[in-house]
């Protein structure tokens, strides 16, 4: 999967959304939302995310109901991983006499606070010299967040919808990630079965 937007607010939130569906056309069918992870059941945070999903389902014509009487059960799950650290090597042409004059592209070693590592970039003979190095290594953490949504028909237990939205971000804050993943999931809902699409959610306007 390609690396998606890394900024939390400055750039659009990009998510890859996969959906498989056999949903009937909305005709007032009722639904109830439950936590796929029992640890989230009854939680205030889960309730806020479930409310966002309910709003989206109502927009397309479904009606919320209690779990005992609903036509469909919507299972909601979400998570963000521990993240992976990435390094970006920045080069300043003002301090590099070889910038654009015969430098050649190959992997080389730089030393970071986590030890030596290979970095792809332009080789410079002054990299290990006593002069000021024209390179700087930026380190940051990339987190992968996902949202899983399933809809089952209560009468016979038939699976009607399976959807997954996944995004990479420099933020690991669920209150930021989950609402964006919900919006991505319901963009063009229910979608074409078996299709994975890239959804961009515009960043919030600064006030």
Residue ranges and their predicted role:
Residues 3-27:
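Bacterial Sec signal peptide processing site at the extreme N-terminus
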Residues 27-40:
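Acidic/histidine-rich, surface-exposed loop or edge segments in extracytoplasmic proteins
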Residues 27-29, 60, 70-74, 143-148, ...:
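Envelope-exposed proteins and targeting segments
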Residues 40-51, 68, 172-180:
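Soluble non-cytosolic domains of exported or imported proteins
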Residues 60-71, 192-201:
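Surface-exposed patches in mature extracellular/periplasmic domains of secreted proteins
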Residues 67-85, 202-206:
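Acidic helix-start/capping segments at beta-turn-to-alpha-helix junctions
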Residues 82-144, 148:
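Low-complexity, compositionally biased segments in intrinsically disordered regions
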Residues 133-139, 146-148, 155-192:
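Short secondary-structure boundary motifs at beta->alpha junctions and helix caps
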């Amino acid at each position: 999967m390609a690396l998606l937007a890394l900024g939390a607010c400055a750039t659009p939130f990009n998510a890859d959304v996969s959906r498989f569906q056999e949903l009937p056309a909305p005709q007032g069918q009722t639904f109830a939302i439950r936590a796929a992870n029992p640890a989230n059941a009854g939680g205030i945070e889960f309730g806020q995310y479930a409310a966002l999903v309910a709003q989206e389902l109502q927009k397309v014509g479904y009606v919320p109901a209690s779990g005992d009487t609903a036509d469909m059960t919507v299972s909601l799950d979400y998570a963000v991983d521990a993240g992976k650290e990435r390094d970006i090597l920045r080069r300043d042409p003002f301090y590099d006499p070889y910038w654009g004059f015969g430098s050649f592209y190959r992997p080389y070693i730089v030393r970071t606070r986590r030890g030596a590592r290979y970095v792809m970039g332009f080789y410079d003979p002054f990299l290990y010299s006593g002069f000021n190095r024209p390179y700087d290594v930026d380190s940051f953490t990339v987190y992968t967040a996902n949202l899983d949504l399933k809809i089952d028909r209560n009468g016979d237990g038939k699976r009607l919808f399976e959807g997954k939205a996944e995004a990479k971000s420099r933020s690991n804050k669920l209150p930021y990630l989950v609402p964006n993943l919900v919006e991505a999931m319901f963009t063009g809902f229910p979608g074409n079965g078996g299709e994975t699409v890239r959804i961009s959610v515009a960043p919030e306007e600064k006030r």
